[in-house]
A protein has these predicted regions:
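Fe(II)/2-oxoglutarate oxygenase catalytic core
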Residues: 1-183, 187-219
């Protein structure tokens, strides 16, 4: 039998030799992309359902994590005049890509092999939570476009959805203390890092994600 191997990602500006990385290090730049609203691993064919983040070393200022509810945004979508109704959107399939999201906020830091290894993947725009049976938007910064739509038209809509998630909801702000652990449901919640002075402070976070049960477009 194959052993289950737990994988822990380091979100950090400190290397494995405990040396602080320079501000322009590719790892630091890559992690800086986490400061935009996203759902963890939505760029994977089977996205994560749960994220577990623990603080090993925190900066004196900044370095927090914000959370926002994407279900409430869907429930209040009709509070404003909309070109597209929820009925228009309920069967939409989007493509997500970490290369797309990072190109938009950190620039092109990837080699050709990484781009080939991380192709666009399909995700539902509206997901039904398997336990609550309630729908929520599934967008965020990794969400590129809607399949079968004009690309720019769909990106305008995705921006409208992402903007409304923030405008409609209340942001829950978490300021970390060393040793704390927080977990959340990526099927309902978007999150982002708040940033910190990477040239001055050290930050070491360990993250584990729990894979979902299937690709969202098959749910």
């Amino acid at each position: 039998t194959n052993a289950i191997r737990a994988e822990i990602s380091r979100i950090s500006n400190v290397d494995l030799n405990n040396k602080k990385l320079p501000y322009d290090d590719k790892k630091v730049i890559f992690d800086r992309g986490n400061n935009t609203w996203h759902a963890d691993s939505s760029f994977k064919e089977t996205p994560s359902k749960i994220s577990i983040l623990s603080a090993r070393e925190v900066p004196e200022e900044g370095g927090g994590t914000d959370f926002i509810d994407a279900r409430y945004a869907l429930e209040t979508w009709n509070k404003k005049p909309r070109k597209y109704s929820l009925n228009d959107l309920k069967n939409c399939i989007c493509e997500h890509s970490i290369v797309y999201s990072r190109m938009n906020n950190t620039g092109d830091i990837f080699d050709d092999k990484f781009k080939q290894d991380m192709p666009y993947v399909k995700q539902k725009l509206i997901r039904i939570h398997p336990y609550t049976k309630k729908p929520a938007f599934y967008a965020g910064s990794h969400c590129s476009h809607i399949l079968g739509w004009d690309k720019e038209e769909s990106r305008t809509l995705i921006k409208e959805i992402n903007d409304w998630i923030i405008e409609a909801g209340c942001i829950a702000k978490h300021e970390w203390k060393t040793g704390e652990l927080v977990l959340w449901d990526n099927r309902r919640v978007l999150h982002r890092g708040t940033g910190y002075d990477e040239s001055k402070y050290r930050r070491v976070m360990h993250r584990t994600t729990v894979a979902g049960d299937m690709p969202s477009y098959m749910e």
